């Protein structure tokens, strides 16, 4: 499965975000159906912070900055645009049924989807993220501050929360390379070249690999 899990936020950043979210009024938290497509809205049952609140805008900027500061995430996703960031919470009996993300949103194309956990996974029961491919189905329950990125073309769901509260940040990435398969080729090539660089230092042979990577990205990127 083509996904990446990475520690994005530290404990201090998580606590600051959660403190600001706690200050938001009940009116700031909207029915999650408001931003879902017509089909997905039929299976969506959660709350999301209004994107127009200052808390949402400020912390969306923080998340964007953190993503763009991660060499690993940039190599994996080749982000052209990070968009649609919002903070959502699911209390007891809330869930998000099996669905596919809209390919085009008002904020951009969805090539990769991401979820960042803001809650200790031991503080709620259920609420696992389910990601499906043609042959597999995997469940994920992230540690606080971890991000998972996966192709938006995958069917996915969030299991019902049985107890506690699941608080996450979600969003989408429009990539310079919209093909999942081609992104994987480039990611492997970049990872291999960087590993050789760290172990053996610069060489004429590595220059050729980095040259080929750059020209391949230039050729297939948008």
Curated annotation (Swiss-Prot):
Residue numbers binding Fe cation: 99, 101, 156
Alphabetical keyword list: Dioxygenase, Iron, Metal-binding, Oxidoreductase, Vitamin C
Protein name: PKHD-type hydroxylase P9301_13621
GO biological process annotation, one example: intracellular iron ion homeostasis
A GO molecular function held by the record: iron ion binding
Native source organism of the sequence: Prochlorococcus marinus (strain MIT 9301)
Domain of life: Bacteria
InterPro entries: Oxoglu/Fe-dep_dioxygenase_dom, PKHD_C, PKHD_hydroxylase, Pro_4_hyd_alph, Pro_4_hyd_alph_FE2OG_OXY
Binding site for 2-oxoglutarate: 166
Stretches assigned to the Fe2OG dioxygenase domain: 81-175
């Amino acid at each position: 499965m083509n996904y990446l899990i990475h520690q994005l936020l530290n404990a201090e950043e998580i606590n600051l975000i959660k403190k600001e979210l706690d200050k938001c009024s009940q009116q700031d938290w909207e029915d999650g159906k408001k931003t879902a497509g017509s089909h997905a809205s039929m299976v969506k049952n959660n709350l999301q912070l209004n994107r127009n609140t200052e808390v949402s805008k400020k912390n969306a900027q923080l998340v964007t900055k953190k993503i763009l500061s991660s060499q690993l995430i940039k190599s994996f996703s080749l982000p052209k645009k990070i968009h649609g960031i919002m903070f959502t919470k699911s209390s007891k009996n809330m869930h998000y049924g099996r669905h596919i993300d809209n390919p085009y949103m008002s904020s951009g194309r969805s090539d990769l989807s991401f979820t960042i956990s803001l809650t200790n996974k031991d503080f709620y029961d259920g609420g696992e993220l389910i990601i499906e491919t043609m042959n597999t189905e995997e469940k994920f329950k992230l540690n606080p501050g971890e991000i998972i990125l996966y192709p938006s073309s995958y069917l996915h769901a969030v299991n019902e929360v049985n107890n506690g509260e699941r608080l996450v940040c979600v969003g989408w990435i429009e990539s310079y390379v919209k093909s999942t398969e081609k992104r994987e080729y480039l990611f492997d090539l970049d990872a291999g070249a960087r590993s050789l660089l760290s172990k053996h230092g610069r060489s004429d042979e590595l220059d050729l690999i980095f040259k080929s990577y750059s020209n391949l990205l230039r050729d297939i990127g948008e």
